[in-house]
Amino acid sequence: MIINSLKRFGITTGAAASAAAKAAVIGLLNREKRNTVVIPTPIGLRLEIPVEKVEIDSGIACAEVKKFSGDNPDILDGLVIRCCAKLNESNEIVIVGGKGVGKVTRSGLKATMGETAISPTVRDMVINAIREVTDKGIQITIEVPNGDIIAENTLNKMVGIVGGISILGTTGIETPVSDDDYLEHIKCELNVIRQSYDFVVIAPGNSAAKYASKLFDSNSIIKVGDRIGDSIKLASSVFRKVILAGLPAKLLKVYAGIFNTHYSQGDARLESLTHASVLAGLPYDVLTKITNALSVEEAFTYMTKEQRRKVMKIVAEKILSRIKSFNGDINFCVIIFDYDGESLSRVGC
């Protein structure tokens, strides 16, 4: 039996940009085309990163580095980050976002509204990498070929970054199969919402967000996927009120105490529904059908609308109780929608 216990780490877009910038500056000043460069990182490690291409012309040099995501399932894996370097008359390093790098259109993010989406940490990484080569003034333009197209498949638009991807990274290194970046995205989006609202609506998925938008301004709603517990904790520290709005199947997991609802973390949907149905006093014949159902949706077909309301009220109350148990000061509300978008239960609202 072969056990694959070694996972591959990757590099962030920020590390790729730093490497491309350093390679471009070496090409500009030394007329040298490097196959690899070594860059410093904020955590003290040094990374040797392959350089795909270096182009040297009169007064300018450009280098390309491919982002490598390791064992992370990442749409940006293999993305080309291109940096072009030229001298400027100052002694400063000026970093400009070019084609394919997104622009920030809303406040609450690390980059200022109106600027390109290059995080302050990445700017420091680029400067530190270049300063290992020269003390001269340099202008660096970061580009991402097809970045505007690739960005359509990312979460950037939801946080107000348009026209391209973000150049990010806090360490320069991507941990394998890590969802830290997704939590960072949730933090960013919560910060954006906080600029306009003192409450936030947490919706696990698209349908929940759609139904919630009938009750709340769509700009106050954040889609968090499976990270319900983490999102509630993050939101509770910055918002006056936190509202969890979802469909039965997802929230039945939370009823059972499963706050990361990814399938790999557990599944107790039908067991939870059966338990809540017993507490609601549903007839034995209905309970039997529920326990034999293959899905929550199927189980719902055996219940009247009034029975659904009674059961989901119990579910919502239990979720409220669970949330209060680890954050007693939170002003929390639970809304459960039926599969047609009708509100079945509202507790704490």
UniProtKB/Swiss-Prot annotation:
Q: In which pathway does it act?
A: Cofactor biosynthesis; adenosylcobalamin biosynthesis; cob(II)yrinate a,c-diamide from sirohydrochlorin (anaerobic route): step 6/10
Q: Which terms under GO biological process does the entry name?
A: anaerobic cobalamin biosynthetic process; methylation
Q: Which GO terms describe its molecular function?
A: cobalt-precorrin-5B C1-methyltransferase activity
Q: What is its EC number?
A: 2.1.1.195
Keywords for the protein's UniProt record, in alphabetical order: Cobalamin biosynthesis, Methyltransferase, S-adenosyl-L-methionine, Transferase
Statement: the UniProt record of this protein carries the keyword Methyltransferase: yes
Q: Which residues form a coiled coil?
A: none
Catalytic activity line of the entry = Co-precorrin-5B + S-adenosyl-L-methionine = Co-precorrin-6A + S-adenosyl-L-homocysteine
InterPro entries xref list:
CbiD, CbiD_sf
NCBIfam families hit by this protein:
cbiD (TIGR00312)
HAMAP family, A to Z: CbiD
Family assignment from sequence similarity: Belongs to the CbiD family.
- Name assigned to this protein: Cobalt-precorrin-5B C(1)-methyltransferase
